[in-house]
Amino acid sequence: MLSQSSQPNQDRKLNSIALYVKDLETARNFFVKYLGAKSNEGYHNTKTSFRSYFLSFDDGARLEIMNKPEMPDFPKEFARTGYAHIAFSVGSKEKVDALTAELKADGYEVVSGPRTTGDGYYESCIVAIEGNQIEITV
């Protein structure tokens, strides 16, 4: 049984999602080019070699992409624990179709759609940077 927190939740919201990547600049360019992200100038900790960018979107959502050169990059199975995809709303079926076609033409693998799912969502899903899935929806 779910119980409600005794704390009011009107001020709670998702602030950001962080994603480690091997190629920070390629990841940054992907989100800027295809999904309209605005990037900060980046952060670099010279002692640890950690680098990151915060990518901001018009609705206030933020994605932090991060890199540590020595971090291993294990194979990413589609059926695994952890996040399944990051979804981006583009506003219309036509825009889902157009962005999916553009990504496919640019060499990204489309793994589903564009289609209407069993629960009524119009979407497509692509394998974007480094095996991570991006869902494009209305």
What function would you assign to each model-found segment?
Residues 1-10, 54-56, 100-138:
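Vicinal oxygen chelate
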Residues 1-26, 83-88:
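N-terminal beta-strand motif that seeds the catalytic metal site of vicinal oxygen chelate
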Residues 2-4, 40-41, 50, 70-75, ...:
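A short, acidic/glycine-rich surface segment
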Residues 11, 20-62:
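Core segments of cupin and vicinal oxygen chelate
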Residues 49, 82, 120:
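Exposed loop/turn and edge beta-strand positions of beta-sandwich/beta-sheet ligand-binding modules
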Residues 58-62, 71, 93:
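Short, charged/polar surface micro-motifs in flexible loops or helix N-caps
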Residues 76-79, 84:
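Helix-adjacent hinge/juxtasegments
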Residues 94-99:
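Short amphipathic alpha-helices within nucleic acid-binding modules
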